[in-house]
């Protein structure tokens, strides 16, 4: 885990026989640090897969830099804003209204809730986790009971809810995530 400061996403690096995956890429302004942490963590291996739990700029701002550094990198995002990424709409992605910077990036597939994805050498479940972001997903590895919750759940609660960004009252959705 690459632990970051307050209001910046941590990054999770998972490696196994099938390759290496990174969960979330951090702010674009932290891209140099993210690349240095990855280089040390990968120990000469390639980064094969990048997953975004949601598309706030502290979780996907480094995507473009990682895609440039690792040309064969496959990127998967939650399905909710895939059309806005495909057509790169920074207003709909809330970057412009919030004054956030997120360089355009591409994606190769979506992280569909209700499916599994192999990270390291184990299958992880993809679950919808609306609340902090209505399109957020969490990743759960049932054998070890390891959860990557991003901003859906925090150590002593849940992430900040922004009803003004999406026009949604997400408090009931947070309760549903807690019930998972």
Stretch-by-stretch model annotation:
Residues 1-43, 138-150:
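Conserved beta-strand hairpin/beta-sheet module of binuclear metal-dependent hydrolase folds
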Residues 27-32, 36-119:
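Active-site HxH/HxHxD metal-binding segment of metal-dependent hydrolases
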Residues 18, 79-82, 88-91, 115, ...:
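Short, flexible active-site-adjacent loop segments at beta-strand->alpha-helix junctions, enriched
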Residues 20, 27-29, 123-180:
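Metallo-beta-lactamase
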């Amino acid at each position: 885990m690459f632990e970051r400061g307050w209001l910046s996403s941590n990054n999770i690096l998972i490696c196994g026989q099938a390759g290496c995956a990174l969960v979330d890429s951090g702010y674009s302004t932290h891209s140099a640090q993210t690349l240095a942490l990855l280089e040390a963590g990968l120990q000469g291996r390639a980064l094969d897969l990048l997953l975004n739990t949601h598309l706030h700029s502290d979780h996907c701002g480094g995507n473009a830099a990682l895609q440039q550094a690792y040309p064969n990198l496959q990127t998967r995002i939650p399905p909710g804003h895939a059309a806005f990424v495909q057509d790169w709409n920074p207003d709909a992605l809330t970057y412009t209204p919030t004054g956030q910077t997120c360089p355009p990036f591409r994606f190769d597939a979506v992280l569909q809730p209700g499916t599994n994805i192999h990270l390291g050498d184990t299958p992880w479940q993809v679950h919808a986790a609306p609340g902090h972001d209505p399109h957020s997903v969490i990743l759960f590895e049932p054998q070890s009971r390891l959860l990557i919750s991003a901003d859906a759940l925090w150590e002593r609660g849940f992430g900040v809810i922004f009803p003004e960004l999406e026009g949604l009252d997400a408090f009931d959705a947070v309760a549903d995530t807690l019930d998972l």
